[in-house]
């Protein structure tokens, strides 16, 4: 006789919030990037509270007053790696109230030239050094400088005969100019 597989295999795969105990949680909201949708703000029950469509945060960050720091797209992957087109602060209704895209003017083959932030992975607005909620450390929403982690291409024959992708930290004034 053949021995059958005696291991149990699940037939139900829970999704969403499976256990929520408000007394044991730091209650709040979660913001995440849904590919091809936008920034989704969810409550502790896993319900969608707000969607900012057409943004591509890398990452998205919520600021006081319902503002969102995000990007509105990425550079074509054939020519850059994780280069944000811009870094923007938008209001609850999706209106741009601050923008930075003047890191580098990019002319990729077959694509109209444009200024890009080339931002990726991190940025901090004056007032908060953490980038997430911390009591007494709220980022400014109508002024202040912003630190932006960005890319620049470099050549250094002591390292490689190939073009290098380098990281830079830019400090950007509220008016969008680099310090």
What are these model-derived regions, one by one?
Residues 1-179:
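Histidine-/acidic-rich catalytic cores in large beta-rich domains
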């Amino acid at each position: 006789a053949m021995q059958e597989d005696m291991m149990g295999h699940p037939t139900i795969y829970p999704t969403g919030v499976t256990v929520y105990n408000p007394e044991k949680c730091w209650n709040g909201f979660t913001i995440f990037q849904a590919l091809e949708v936008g920034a989704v703000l969810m409550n502790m029950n896993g319900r969608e509270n707000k969607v900012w469509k057409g943004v591509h945060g890398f990452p998205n960050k919520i600021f006081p007053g319902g503002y969102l720091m995000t990007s509105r797209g990425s550079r074509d992957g054939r020519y850059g790696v994780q280069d944000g087109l811009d870094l923007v602060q938008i209001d609850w209704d999706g209106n741009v109230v601050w923008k930075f895209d003047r890191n580098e003017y990019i002319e990729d083959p077959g694509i109209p030239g444009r200024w890009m932030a080339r931002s990726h992975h991190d940025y901090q607005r004056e007032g908060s050094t953490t980038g997430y909620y911390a009591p007494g450390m709220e980022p400014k929403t109508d002024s202040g400088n912003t630190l932006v982690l960005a890319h620049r291409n470099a050549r250094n024959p002591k390292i490689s005969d190939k073009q290098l992708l380098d990281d830079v930290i830019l400090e950007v004034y509220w008016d969008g100019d680099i310090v």
